[in-house]
C-alpha cells in the first residue's frame, strides 16, 4: 500500500479519518452505501463494496478497488463539471 499525499498530511497519532458506515449491511445485501463523508479514508475492508458519494449535486456511484485504499472517498467524485466550449453561429 502506498500512502496517499493527503494521508501523510494528517498527524500519525490521530489516525485515519473514519466515519461509521453500514459495511455489514452492504456486504450481505450488496446495496451501495450512500454517504456525504467525502473526507473519510478508504480502508482495506471497503474493497469490493459499492459507494454512492455526494458531489454537492448528486450521488456518484463508485466501486472500491485495492488501488484506492488509503485515499479519500471525495477524490473519486469530482465536484466541478468539465468546461466544454460550444461555438455559436453569428447571424
Curated annotation (Swiss-Prot):
GO annotation, biological process: mitochondrial translation; ribosomal small subunit assembly
Organism domain of life: Eukaryota
GO cellular component term of the entry, any: mitochondrial inner membrane
Keywords noted in UniProt: Mitochondrion, Ribonucleoprotein, Ribosomal protein
Record InterPro entries: Ribosomal_uS19, Ribosomal_uS19_CS, Ribosomal_uS19_SF
Subcellular location(s) per record: Mitochondrion
SUPFAM superfamilies on file: Ribosomal protein S19
Gene Ontology terms, MF aspect: RNA binding; structural constituent of ribosome
UniProt keyword annotation of Protein biosynthesis present: no
Residue stretches spanning the membrane: none
Known partners and oligomeric status: Component of the mitochondrial small ribosomal subunit (mt-SSU). Mature yeast 74S mitochondrial ribosomes consist of a small (37S) and a large (54S) subunit. The 37S small subunit contains a 15S ribosomal RNA (15S mt-rRNA) and 34 different proteins. The 54S large subunit contains a 21S rRNA (21S mt-rRNA) and 46 different proteins.
Similarity comment: family membership: Belongs to the universal ribosomal protein uS19 family.
Primary role: Component of the mitochondrial ribosome (mitoribosome), a dedicated translation machinery responsible for the synthesis of mitochondrial genome-encoded proteins, including at least some of the essential transmembrane subunits of the mitochondrial respiratory chain. The mitoribosomes are attached to the mitochondrial inner membrane and translation products are cotranslationally integrated into the membrane.
Protein name: Small ribosomal subunit protein uS19m
Organism of provenance: Saccharomyces cerevisiae (strain ATCC 204508 / S288c) (Baker's yeast)
Gene: RSM19
